[in-house]
Amino acid sequence: GNTVMIVEHHREVIALADHIVDMGPEAGINGGQIMYQGSYENLLKADTVTGRMLRTKTPMKMEYRKPTGWYQVEHAKLHNLKDLSVKLPLGVMTVIAGVAGSGKSSLMEYFMSQYPGEVISIRQKDIGINLRSTPATYLDIADAIRALFAKANHVAQAYFSFNSKGACPACQGKGVIISDMAYMDSIETVCEVCHGTRYSKEVLKYQYKGKNIAEVMDMTVRQAIQFFEDADFVKKLDTLVQVGLGYLHLNQSMTTLSGGELQRVKLASKLDERGQIFILDEPTDGLHLDDIRRLMKLFNRMTDQGNTLFIIEHSLDVMKDADYIVELGPGGGLAGGSLLFAGTPKEMLEAERSVTREYLRESL
């Protein structure tokens, strides 16, 4: 007798629903419309991004990159890993697969502790953010924007920072008032003085190209690229567009972003890397099927640039585009930690011990 409402992107969950509401057409300010509502059967016929993606099954890649080398993991016993030994390929895109709790993250944690070179970890727990973190501060372009305002108005740069002299006196630049409810979760309300802009009234009087600092910081990444045109930091903004985050606002609190979005913000700052090893922890978390398709193009480009990618992932669409798959299991916790399979996606289809094999076959 319960009503269950699920925010979801997975094909399998969408197919189980009695009623589906498809939002769009895009993300951020370009979304917010109901594109379709009704049954799953009719969604498959609908001319929406979701409908088109559900009608299309991602093909399996049949030509695989050749590893430039291998790293041998020997007798790993971290957490639930059961004396696990496996050769990990370098210079290619590898998916670390397995059911929840099977030891995927433990394997990568052990690898990072043993590998003699640098490893770039892009995992949700590694991204340090707080209530004041925004895409502008994370990409280190906020100072450059403040400098433009300061130069145009002949005042100190600190006036255009909500972490300094420009902060709203009521909320101290947070944009919200946090009320501590003792035995209950804290309640956040929009600041009534600055109305969420984070800045003092005095600062908002200053303008650059007809906009005040709050209006500029409230722009989306795509809008900011057009507004600032030839500024040096536009290149950094473009990296967010490349990872599919052009809809984010410069001042958007990063605490509002999904795990997948957070990883892509960090990934944006690493797009020019060559010959590096990356570990990505479920980067498709919270992503639409179309977002995953675009993300895989980016991952393939990174691999072609000579990087090694290890992707901890459950998405079959990602597995089908990998060069190599390492599967752990068979279960989670104490029932996991064993090597079930290591090879190409095509070889997985014939692997009798693989738990994932059955689902990979069904997805073709």
Regions found by a protein language model. Give the residues of each.
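Conserved phosphate-binding elements of NTP-dependent enzyme cores
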Residues: 1-364
